[in-house]
């Protein structure tokens, strides 16, 4: 009887851990976001990418983008961003920005909205959440990869599904 009870609690804890991790991830996102740019969930973006023309902007550093990015994304380096970099994008086009977790991309999204872009959204949880949800990413050679540049060891804790690359 005692073994069965211990096994039950062990099984319950295993089932409970993933939900706990997502809650913690969501709490972290809530603490980072200013909620100044609408968010789009990974599953909705995945669906839209197959049906609509979307300008997908990766706002991470070039070395992060080189490790992996979402197929079809264009690099808009956060550290060197100028609104003129987006001049080729029509102001009424749908634009989705992302970074590692959504913090840097939200700042770029704010600038795009302030410049008159009408349909800007921020990928919730960034490329980390995209990959955590099991979606495909590609490397600089346009080949599928599981590697994600996690910025540093501290931020690596938020990537649950993939190979963590930093430094």
For every predicted segment, state its role.
Residues 1-8:
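Bacterial N-terminal signal peptides that target proteins for export
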Residues 2, 20-43, 50, 66-93, ...:
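Rhodanese-like catalytic fold shared by cysteine-dependent sulfurtransferases
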Residues 8-18:
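Bacterial N-terminal signal peptides
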Residues 45, 53-60, 73:
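Short hydrophobic beta-strand that contains or immediately precedes a catalytic carboxylate
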Residues 55, 94-96:
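Structural motif
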Residues 58, 98, 123:
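Active-site-adjacent beta-strand anchor residues
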Residues 100-104:
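Gly/Ser/Thr-rich loops at beta-strand to alpha-helix junctions
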